[in-house]
Amino acid sequence: MTSVVVVGTQWGDEGKGKITDFLSADAEVIARYQGGDNAGHTIVIDGKKFKLHLIPSGIFFPQKISVIGNGVVVNPKSLVKELAYLHDEGVTTDNLRISDRAHVILPYHIQLDQLQEDAKGDNKIGTTIKGIGPAYMDKAARVGIRIADLLDKDIFAERLRINLAEKNRLFEKMYDSTPLDFDAIFEEYYAYGQEIKQYVTDTSVILNDALDAGKRVLFEGAQGVMLDIDQGTYPFVTSSNPVAGGVTIGSGVGPSKINKVVGVCKAYTSRVGDGPFPTELFDEVGERIREVGHEYGTTTGRPRRVGWFDSVVMRHSRRVSGITNLSLNSIDVLSGLDAVKICVAYDLDGERIDYYPASLEQLKRCKPIYEELPGWQEDITGVRSLDELPENARNYVRRIGELVGVRISTFSVGPGREQTNILESVWASI
């Protein structure tokens, strides 16, 4: 029984897809356990970029099983589109399995997402308008439609009719918005269900059988710990649990079967959308990092906010997700800077604190306390070991490991598979 969980430790966009793809080489099953198509991940294979939003990164290994678990909310329209994209690129999807217990995102979820965000005015939370939150709301309210329901024509029609009638009343009475048509949605989405039917099964059986047989299973999280609905910067969060604990709920695998948790982070910090960001940069250094790091959202295309590495955030992520290993990405983006900074603590009203406050009002008053290290000018994109890094870059990497309190297993100096360097094999140490 061997399992590894990959989680983002910041606000998403840390390079989880790349690290999952890298670790997938030694896994036999790869599974997503939460989120939806609001999370984009980019994988580079032989110089070619593949951008996925819903299907696990492991799909590029045809001999391995890729799983969309029950904790994921699935937009069938997006899924069918993504399948077609992969097929057009010559990628087989015969190895995909989708949980029959996963909940379905429907057009009324997306419309409600947009209307709710618009109604917030200046208090918007920066949702991707993918219907994720409303779909999870229906799930919690026990009125959601699952993949198993989508495949049954009569059940789907009955539940869609009830849900749409309620949502249309809401659209018309509360938001003065146009109601949606039952027949159009039913016809379109039932057809999508038939297209994905071949992939649908009880994925908890597949995952537990694989683990019981001694196979290596890799769990892939979406977003990041700081976007977790319980542990993140609430309410500027997603509607699910990206933390490692979300695996057990979102996959049907018990906590006793989880061996390692790999936390993925960048050598700096980025965030899409609104919400607290203590180390955010507004100067030319921030702009340089954004441009060199191509910091634009995979899903939204929006410029990401960028800032210095925040070890307070990282220690919070380590604690609430039980991180055992760290994967440090995008070190190369910092090349050329005269100095680099790491936030080691916050100043809150004159008091030094080393924890991440839950209160948004306190976070607004938090000022980062920095440790400054000398930068490096060398191009490190061809580096293949820690010893090959310039001394200043090597010291920066080591200092991050010390401040976070987790050993660094891999570090990356570019987007390619070959630019990921192993310091310690996660699989071998289990």
UniProtKB/Swiss-Prot annotation:
InterPro entries: Adenylosuccin_syn_GTP-bd (IPR018220), Adenylosuccin_syn_Lys_AS (IPR033128), Adenylosuccinate_synth_dom1 (IPR042109), Adenylosuccinate_synth_dom2 (IPR042110), Adenylosuccinate_synth_dom3 (IPR042111), Adenylosuccinate_synthetase (IPR001114), P-loop_NTPase (IPR027417). The active site is at 13 (proton acceptor), 41 (proton donor). Coiled coil: none annotated. Pathway: Purine metabolism; AMP biosynthesis via de novo pathway; AMP from IMP: step 1/2. Keywords: Cytoplasm, GTP-binding, Ligase, Magnesium, Metal-binding, Nucleotide-binding, Purine biosynthesis. Binds 1 Mg(2+) ion per subunit. Belongs to the adenylosuccinate synthetase family. NCBIfam families: PRK01117.1, purA. Homodimer. This is Adenylosuccinate synthetase. The lineage of its organism: Bacteria, Bacillati, Bacillota, Bacilli, Lactobacillales.
